[in-house]
């Protein structure tokens, strides 16, 4: 094992060079076998970001009344979940849900988030989801999620401490009848959300939306920020005014809950040499009913019908490409 340090200099006055540790190991063979383990149960954190402006009362009620459809998926898959709700209001406000100085991005409700052991969890979620209609008419759902998943919210015992788990999947669900008006461009928020799990864990994070955009043949017209974020982060998007809420909650649950499907290789692989086994059984290379290799991310992804089951051992054998 060899170690070293990169020293990165810059032209910012008063800024010292940045030192980056480097660790590497030489090998004398191109034969490689990577072994992965599927979790015994999925860990998922779900953050609902709900518009609390004056026109949202009916949609909040629909969200609350259809939560049972959503949570049934989690129960059937034996998911270890955290589910919390915040509003799109990131301004200082005195009304519901910002009563008592609730900071922007702070989880709503006396029970901040629900888990499988929360008593009467359906009733608790229904209470938390009714975030009120006296919030700002300048809806900033992406900014609210950014604040909710950043210090000081993540370290505040009165707000979000304990909700976010670094080793869990993260799914965000934005619900609004107006376009997002957050101050930063979409790529700022997408990059931040992805950074929470790292580039090698892209399948651990999703964003979905029930929003104002009109979608025709997969193309958005009108207010498209929530649609674009959902598209870039491989989630579900539905128009809020044409939504069959029960079906939409089922679709979002199917995207949010589940086992890991993507596994990153330790060395750059020669694609033709790849062989994949799950619990000792060979799985064929087939994007529809097996696995496929992505040379850009150097990862193996399983199709929906071939996901490794709970506790499974995944073995990937291949010849590594010698890099200059």
Q: How should these model regions be labeled?
A:
Residues 295-303:
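Extracellular adhesion/glycan-binding regions together with long Ser/Thr-
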Residues 24-296, 318-324:
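Divalent cation-coordinating acidic motifs and surrounding scaffolds
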Residues 13-15, 78, 309:
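A cross-taxa feature marking solvent-exposed loop/turn segments within ectodomains of secreted
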